[in-house]
Amino acid sequence: MTPVLRLINRTGLVTQICIGLLAGIALALFAPAVARDLAFLGKVFVTALKAVAPVLVFILVMASIANHRHGQETHIRPILWLYLLGTFAAAVVAVAASMLFPSSLVLSTSEASLSAPGGIGEVLQNLLLSAVDNPINALLNANFIGILTWAIGLGVALRHASDTTRGVVEDLSNGVTLIVRVVIRFAPLGIFGLVSATLAQSGLDALLGYLHLLAVLIGCMLFVALVMNPLIVFWKIRRNPYPLVLMCLRESGITAFFTRSSAANIPVNLALSQKLGLHEDTYSVSIPLGATINMAGAAITITVLTLAAVHTLGIPVDLPTAVLLSVVAAICACGASGVAGGSLLLIPLACSLFGIPSEIAMQVVAVGFIIGVLQDSAETALNSSTDVLFTAAACQAMEQRSA
């Protein structure tokens, strides 16, 4: 083995990612033309993650359920409640921050030609339709609700299959997991390409006009990540939550920040869950499920941008309406489903609570896309790191009870 390969093997993945991050920033500042040419490194990495994630989830969930023995305990229900509690708590934090530090928008006159859902019923209907999607179509389009539905269905059916069949499914799961490990090893190069290209192409000039709005958004996400989530985890495990919280932010949040897709970060979260020694039958289901419904960052984005529009238009907001907005934002956030920028398209739905017409609401969406370089990255980092955090908290709480 060459000295370079030995050094790479000795250096931790997080350290390598940090080196790639700093190198990407330096290249974008000093040689932006070269940085733009290296954008393909980031594209290849994100594409590889997105390609492997649907197959990984399908095979892993199916294998987990097919090989599940009667009497083995899983902790999906408490994790599901943690996901819902965390998303609602994030929406409440966003409402409080927007009331304390109201933001004003300079709404653009250009109309965004985007298709946004018409109501909560439509969001729930879309989720139901996603669940009964054709399995091949679900895999092709990374429809994780449909993938989960078919994986669970096939897994339950294969529980009655022969040991040989279940062994083949388990071997497939191990094979796909090995491929994922190889892809994740290229994360430092991918992060290097993503950071250098993003800074070289967009720069930070476009964000300067929205500093207050960004401060409220990022502030809410940091508060949820460093205060609210640790409180929820402490309530579950009854000990210092910060070692676990910081590990999840460092090993899951950093990668998610740059891939900007909860779906693409599923392999990273599964690898971290394995590293933490969590219950495999639990995390193989809860992590892909979290990428679909655990959307604390999306709830914050929907709430803050909606209340910014409300404040700009001078519409009064009473407490019951604010509480209703928190509930609506939490429900709508579940429809964001790991799509980069997906939460922005749900803003018109929340704006409709205040009678804001679609034309103005879509201008707010346009503002969201302008600040999306930071907003979407921070949102995904919070969403994805919380998936593994709550899974770990629930698993550790159950282990303490059974000890």
Curated annotation (Swiss-Prot):
Keywords: Amino-acid transport, Cell inner membrane, Cell membrane, Membrane, Symport, Transmembrane, Transmembrane helix, Transport. The chain crosses the membrane at residues 14-34, 45-65, 79-99, 138-158, 175-195, 214-234, 295-315, 327-347, 353-373. It is found in: Cell inner membrane. One of its GO terms (molecular function) is neutral L-amino acid:sodium symporter activity. It catalyses: L-serine(in) + Na(+)(in) = L-serine(out) + Na(+)(out); L-threonine(in) + Na(+)(in) = L-threonine(out) + Na(+)(out). Pfam families: SDF (PF00375). GO terms for biological process: serine transport; threonine transport. Its main location: membrane. It comes from the Bacteria. GO terms for cellular component: plasma membrane. It is a multi-pass membrane protein. PANTHER family: PROTON/GLUTAMATE-ASPARTATE SYMPORTER (PTHR42865), SERINE_THREONINE TRANSPORTER SSTT (PTHR42865:SF8). Involved in the import of serine and threonine into the cell, with the concomitant import of sodium (symport system). Belongs to the dicarboxylate/amino acid:cation symporter (DAACS) (TC 2.A.23) family. This is Serine/threonine transporter SstT.
